[in-house]
Amino acid sequence: MIFIDETWTKTNMTRLYGWAEVGHRLVDAVPHGHWNTSTFIAGLRCDGLVAPCVFDGAINGEAFLAYIEQVLVPTLRRGDIVVMDRLSSHKVAGVRKAIEGAGARLLYLPPYSPDLNPIEQAFAKLKALLRAKAARSVGALWKALGDLAPCFAPAECANFLRHAGYFWSS
């Protein structure tokens, strides 16, 4: 199974919590004003993140179809099940055909059920790591994403699936 989703990343991401000595206020710089947003798309298998890709700004159906055809499909194996939410850009013409043309099946999650998509947990960890990196330019953000994508161990990815209720036997 491969769970597909996208998440936003911004050049103004900063840690939300921190430590300071007792009696002292924690002070940190937080960028205000102009920042750039990127969209990170990836798939989650039980053994790691696959087909990671970054887009400048938000994506639409055309960009998502290009991701499916050019990035995801080459990683698919016959018999794979691709699972994604019901975002309108995920249902554009050509997405199902491209996935099924690779010998995989496409399933959509029920509406309003992010808890059934284990990649959400991976994205939560990814965003925490990105906040710690404090990338302030698009280039630095994209490099950080590239550096962090391989940081997800197979056991950790399997636990994300297990936590979302997906079980399998070896």
Q: What is each model feature region?
A:
Residues 1-170:
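Short functional hotspots at interaction and active-site rims
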